[in-house]
Structures are given as C-alpha cells and as structure tokens.
Regions:
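Residue-level signal for transmembrane alpha-helical positions in Major Facilitator Superfamily
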Residues: 4, 139-142, 190, 228, ...
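Long, hydrophobic alpha-helical segments
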Residues: 86-91, 126-152, 156
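Helix-loop interface residues and adjacent transmembrane-helix termini in multi-pass membrane transporters
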Residues: 153, 239-240
Length: 476
C-alpha cells in the first residue's frame, strides 16, 4: 500500500510540475465557470418567463364570461414546461424540444418530430455546457497528463529499474491510475461540487430531496467516468513503446468515442428505424380517423351504430327522448375514439425513437462516453424520456378536461339550445390547473436500463482487470 501511495504522490508532483497542465486547468476552470454562470442564469430566467406566461394564461382562462361548455373546451389552454433544476449543468435536448403545448378539444397537438428534437447525437456540439466540457474536454486533459506515465519510463529505461526493485506490475498500474484519477477528481469533481453548491445557495427553492439525490448520482457518474479515462490512459501508455505513440492512440480513441461512434449510432438508428415526418405522422392519423368514422356525419356507419346502441340501452326511438343531451354524449365518444387512435400512433412513434437511440445504448458497452452522455441526460431530467413523459401528462390532462366539458354538455345543456346555452363560469373556473408530476431518479434510470447495465459492466471490468488482468501485461 505504501508503494502505491508513493507512486500516487510522484504522479501528482509530475503533473503539477507540467506547466502546460496547469495552463489547461486554468483554461478549463474559466470555461466551466462561464458555462455554469450562463447555464444557471439562463435556466432561472427561462423558468421565470415561463411561470409568468403560465400565470397569464391561467388568469385569461378563469376570466372568461359565462360560456357554452363546448366553447370553453375549444378556448383551449396553454401549458409551459419548466426547465429541470439540473438543466443548468446538462442541457440535453432542452434546446431543441418544445417548451409549451396548446391543449384543446378534439385535437392532440403533436410533439416536435424533428431529428434535432429527439436526437441524442452530435447536435449538442454547438452548446457550451458544464456537461459537455466534462464529457469531451476533460478526457483530453487526462490523456495529456497521462500519456507518458509508463511509456516515457519505458523509453528512458527507468521502468526496468523499478521492476528490478520488485515493484509489482499491478501496484505500478494501480498507483499510476490512482494518481491521474485523484488529481483529475480533485480538480473537476471538486468544480462540480462547488458549482452545484453555489447554484443551490443562489436558488434554494430548486433544492429538493429528489434534486439532491440526482445531483449526488451525477457526481458519482462523472467520477467513475474520470476513473475509466485514467485507467484507459495508463493501459495504453503501458502498451506503447514511446509517449508520442501513446498520445496518438489516445487522440484517435477520443475521436472514435466522442465523434465517430456517436454519429454512427445516430445514422444507423435512422437507417434501421426510419421515423415519419410530422406531416406523415398527422396524415396517418387522419387516414385512420376516416376509416373509423366521422362523428359530424349523420350517416357515418360507426356513429350510426353508436346512436342505435345508445337508443336501445335507454329504450327510446329518438335522441330527443334520451334523458340527456345526445350531442354531449356523442362528443365524448368521438373524443375517446380519436384519443385512443392518437395515443396508439404516438406510442408507435416513440417506440421508433427509442429503437433509434437503443443503438447508442448498446454501444455504451464499448464506448464509456455514450454511457456517460445518456445517463447524464437521464439523471438531470433533460433526456427524451422526461420530455415524452411531459407530453403524456399534458395529454392526459387535456383528455380529462375535454371529457369534463363533454359531461357538462351532456347533462346540463338543453338539447334544443345545444350550441347557444351558456353555463355559469364558475363551472370551469374551479378546474385545477395543470401541474407536472416530477419523476424520481429511479424512474429516470429505469428508462435507461441498457445504459445502466453498461455502467455496471465498466465498473466490473475495471475491478476484474485490477484483480486478475494486469499480471499478463508486459511492461519491459
């Protein structure tokens, strides 16, 4: 253990003596602080704006005069999605996904179907976030400070002396890895903790137990990633004859993992699981609706059958003899049919996007960057699963609201004044506003089961390599 501590101590001294490393730390520190400041301020400002708009929408909604319930259902309601508390750190798809949905009767406003909106690919390169710096630039820093850690010792003959002194290969690699890892963690994980602390001190209302748990997992996730990068750096340095060769291999590996494989995963996903455009999506729904029937057509087969069944159930011959307003009853059935059809198409579409993104999830077993990126977005609530959950919750709210007004129309509006009778505005003013039910960390991770298994795989792989694998590596 003492020999490992000595190796770690020497590694720290070597890194600190490297002026370029110190300059890079300064540059990265400035970038991290700038990204953190922009992220925190933008997240806070966006949420203030969206909350203000949401209050204005609510005020306009409750200030409506007495109306026909069907008119109210078509008046609509605009819902804004607040940015997650940790989106200041990891933008995810926030910059590409929509932030508001208009809810109205008989119409499901579709999600943004652009590739940008649902992509987990390379579109994030144009954004400067803390997560992007830690995911792509910090590995380069680790490669730079560690590429010669064993290769240079091998080329100048010092390694033979160390091995002759009886230092085991496993301890040597352990010490070098821990030295690079501990230095990187002290600097960059420390920066994460500092920024998170300052952000939550500045905006204490955002710090809930759920957000704290997500923050802790994010810190653990990035810490493990730094260890993987340190471990890979030492292994490649150990297998290289010179430091320059090791650096070349490491840069090629960075390009492969950070640029080529993510883009390849995206393109392969699109090729294997093509998704319809927004126009195609809506056209398919319209075509299926035409096959089901049109509630506005008195001669439509489906709704004629529905009318006959309703009359038979109440033992009457005409809708005028029903104990309720048939128009409201018919609208409720039409809403049910169209909603079921839309949800079936929507679920199929989301399955397509999930299949596209599964390519990157499976590649996480060979690419730790993809593992980190996917879990980082999941943990911070900025991935596709959270956005789709928001869409589904708003759709459920829209359906409940619409059916409530259909029931009012059915039971409280006179059939002879179906289109003109107004109800007291108190009947819709007391409806609860939409409130998004935040999901916990375990829900977020459960939607990334494959990537989570890849995370466990990398940890087990490293543990096994330190236990059994390093004895076979030839350093001399």
């Amino acid at each position: 253990m003492n020999s490992i501590k000595n190796i770690v101590r020497v590694e720290w001294k070597n890194i600190i003596r490297t002026k370029t490393a110190m300059v890079l730390i300064g540059v990265f520190a400035i970038l991290l602080l700038f990204a953190a400041f922009i992220g925190v301020e933008n997240t806070a400002a966006q949420n203030v704006i969206r909350q203000s708009y949401q209050e204005q929408v609510r005020d306009d909604y409750v200030d409506q005069p007495d109306r026909n319930p069907h008119r109210v259902s078509h008046y609509g309601y605009l819902v804004f999605r607040e940015r997650p508390a940790l989106s200041f750190f990891e933008f995810g798809i926030e910059s590409f996904a929509g932030n508001s949905i208009f809810l109205e009767a008989h119409r499901q406003n579709t999600v943004n179907l652009s590739e940008a909106g649902f992509s987990n690919g390379m579109l994030r390169f144009g954004e400067l976030s803390m997560a992007l710096i830690l995911q792509l630039l910090v590995p380069l820093f680790i490669f730079f400070i560690g590429y010669g850690t064993l290769a240079d010792l091998k080329s100048n003959g010092v390694l033979k002396i160390m091995l002759a002194q009886g230092i085991p290969i496993r301890k040597l690699i352990w010490g070098k890895t821990l030295g690079i890892f501990s230095f990187t963690t002290t600097v960059f994980t420390g920066a994460m903790l500092l920024v998170f602390s300052i952000a939550f001190i500045a905006y204490p209302e955002e710090l809930t137990s759920a957000v704290l748990l997500r923050s802790i997992f994010a810190v653990i996730l990035y810490t493990v990633f730094f260890f993987i990068c340190s471990w890979v750096t030492v292994l490649i340095s150990a297998k290289s004859s010179r430091g320059g060769t090791a650096l070349l291999w490491l840069i090629m590996l960075w390009m492969l993992c950070g640029i080529i494989l993510p883009k390849m995963a995206q393109n392969v996903g699109y090729a294997l699981f093509p998704a319809p455009s927004k126009l195609e999506f809506e056209t398919r729904i319209t075509e299926d609706l035409e096959q089901v029937g049109d509630s506005h057509d008195p001669d439509d087969a489906y709704y004629t059958s529905f009318r006959e069944k309703t009359l038979a159930a109440y033992g009457v011959d005409d809708v005028k003899d029903l104990p309720f307003n048939y128009a409201g009853h018919l609208m409720a059935e039409g809403e049910r049919v169209t909603t079921e059809l839309y949800r079936a198409h929507f679920d199929k579409l989301i399955d397509t996007y999930n299949n596209q993104n599964s390519i990157a999830a499976y590649l996480s077993f060979v690419n730790p960057y993809l593992m980190l990126r996917n879990l980082s977005m999941a943990v911070t609530g900025t991935d596709m699963a959270h956005y789709i959950d928001f869409q589904k919750q708003t759709e459920d709210y829209r359906y409940r609201q619409t059916q409530y007004f259909n029931e009012l129309h059915k039971n409280e509006v006179d059939a002879e004044r179906s289109g003109t009778q107004r109800l007291d505005s108190s009947r819709f003013k007391d409806r609860d506003p939409f409130e998004y039910q935040n999901r916990d960390l375990f829900w977020a991770l459960s939607n990334n089961g494959i990537t989570l298994m890849a995370f466990a795989f990398w940890i087990i792989l490293i543990a096994l390599s330190f236990s059994f694998g390093f004895q076979k590596i030839k350093l001399s």
